[in-house]
């Protein structure tokens, strides 16, 4: 197996196959669920808006893949600093049956100098998730923070407040995941000594098998080849799947999606 094939197989099994579009429908989510089951293995999860969780749960069960996890988003995509709303949305997502919640950190508040509200928001959402055995991923929106010190600070605050994963991006802004921001965030995980309990998720802009290979190489360099499993590493993507399957000898690499 070539290096690209090996990394593509790893990446496929770490995917949060995503649709977060305004025109999402039950039919589109059902189609997404069908895509999670591939000839070379299943994706780790799907990531969808909360209202589609029940139909996704039913579809995954019917196709014989109930173990595929369902992630959803809250405080999304704006990352406002209203803790009550973020918490209410997170509780609603849990009530819908989410296995994982990807909450947007109040990154603009941090850029304006307020570190406390981010901590408090993540901590409140974490308490709700922990009580329901739901994983919490915190999206820090690196492409808006831009500055290395801010990316580092948002990562540190999220981890201190209880994040199970730190995630680069919503996929809804001009700049999403980059290898540079990924390295900064994973270095924070390493420097804080929390690699056993905190994972990393690049999202948005990871489109090709070669992209995925680059991101996995950074994780392998920092933590060794065994770290990036489904509890510690995810790719938030949709168009990536077709490219991975093509690298693995299935399909033509074409995808209808841009995430």
From Swiss-Prot:
GO CC, one annotated term: cytoplasm
Active site, UniProt feature: 102 (proton donor/acceptor), 167 (schiff-base intermediate with acetaldehyde), 201 (proton donor/acceptor)
Keyword line: Cytoplasm, Lyase, Schiff base
Gene Ontology MF term list: deoxyribose-phosphate aldolase activity
UniProt subcellular location: Cytoplasm
The reaction(s) this protein catalyses: 2-deoxy-D-ribose 5-phosphate = D-glyceraldehyde 3-phosphate + acetaldehyde
EC number: 4.1.2.4
Chief location: cytoplasm
SUPFAM superfamilies named in the record: Aldolase
Gene3D superfamilies: Aldolase class I
GO biological process: 2-deoxyribose 1-phosphate catabolic process; carbohydrate catabolic process; deoxyribonucleotide catabolic process
Superkingdom of origin organism: Bacteria
Pathways involved: Carbohydrate degradation; 2-deoxy-D-ribose 1-phosphate degradation; D-glyceraldehyde 3-phosphate and acetaldehyde from 2-deoxy-alpha-D-ribose 1-phosphate: step 2/2
Top class in the EC scheme: lyase
Cross-referenced NCBIfam families: deoC
Function: Catalyzes a reversible aldol reaction between acetaldehyde and D-glyceraldehyde 3-phosphate to generate 2-deoxy-D-ribose 5-phosphate.
Family label: Belongs to the DeoC/FbaB aldolase family. DeoC type 2 subfamily.
Name of the protein described by the UniProt record: Deoxyribose-phosphate aldolase
């Amino acid at each position: 197996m070539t290096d690209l094939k090996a990394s593509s197989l790893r990446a496929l099994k770490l995917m949060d196959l995503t649709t977060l579009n305004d025109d999402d429908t039950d039919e589109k989510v059902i189609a997404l669920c069908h895509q999670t089951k591939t000839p070379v293995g299943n994706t780790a999860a799907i990531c969808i808006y909360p209202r589609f969780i029940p139909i996704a749960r039913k579809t995954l069960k019917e196709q014989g893949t109930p173990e595929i996890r369902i992630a959803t988003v809250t405080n999304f995509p704006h990352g406002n600093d209203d803790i009550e709303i973020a918490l209410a949305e997170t509780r609603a997502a849990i009530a819908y049956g989410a296995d994982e919640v990807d909450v947007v950190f109040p990154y603009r508040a941090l850029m304006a100098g307020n570190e406390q509200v981010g901590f408090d928001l993540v901590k409140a959402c974490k308490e709700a998730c922990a009580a329901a055995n739901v994983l919490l991923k915190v999206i820090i929106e690196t492409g808006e923070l831009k500055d290395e010190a801010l990316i580092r600070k948002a990562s540190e605050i999220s981890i201190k407040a209880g994040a199970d994963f730190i995630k680069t991006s919503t996929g809804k802004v001009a700049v999403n995941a980059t290898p540079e921001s990924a390295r900064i965030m994973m270095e924070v995980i390493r420097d804080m000594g929390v690699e056993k309990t905190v994972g990393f998720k690049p999202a948005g802009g990871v489109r090709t098998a070669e992209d995925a290979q680059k991101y996995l190489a950074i994780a392998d360099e920092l933590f060794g080849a065994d770290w990036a499993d489904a509890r510690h590493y995810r790719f938030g993507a949709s168009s990536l799947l077709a490219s991975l399957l093509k690298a693995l000898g299935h399909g033509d690499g074409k995808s209808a999606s841009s995430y």
